Amino acid sequence: MDLKDEIGEKATVINEELKKSLAFKGLKIYDAMRHLILGGGKRLRPVIAMLSCEAVGGKNNDSIPFAVAVELVHNFTLLHDDIMDKDELRRGMKTTHVVFGEPRTIIAGDALFALAYEEILKLKIKPEKLKILLKDFSVMVREIAEGQDMDIDFESRNDVSEKEYLEMVGRKTARIIKTAAMGGAMIGNGTAK
């Protein structure tokens, strides 16, 4: 199987797991939580987690809860980012806050964030590893927020240096990819090497 097919296959697995994870009923918040995340996406970040697990000899299925958690956090940040940027479209569809309003979208994002931790706690790994994974995951979310804060400041500046821009992107975009790769490798019993 070539890499493109493997990525597609893993993305399909993630999509099915996301549907299961988001199968709540009864409140409008649940529809808001599902709107963007089940509306499509490449699933690059969770696929990286799964591939990293396999690359060090781990089993694909072992990393699925973590991969789902990574995608939940990614989408939680997108919900909040769309509100801040006043974006009306994402992935060719109306943004969540346009459909459900800003207050409900904020709490939907918060709920996706909480659900990510519920997914991580499904992992069958040693407590010491879980502690390291949870610490890195929490630091990742904080650094994403720091990157978003920098992004907000940059909107009112016309003197943003390349170094500042790369630092912002490193916190917002690269950090979640780093966590996906590191977490997947850790779940697969990879070493620091």
Predicted regions and their residues:
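N-terminal amphipathic/basic leader segments beginning at the initiator methionine
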Residues: 1-20
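Mg2+-dependent prenyl diphosphate-binding active-site environment of isoprenoid biosynthetic enzymes
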Residues: 19, 23-193
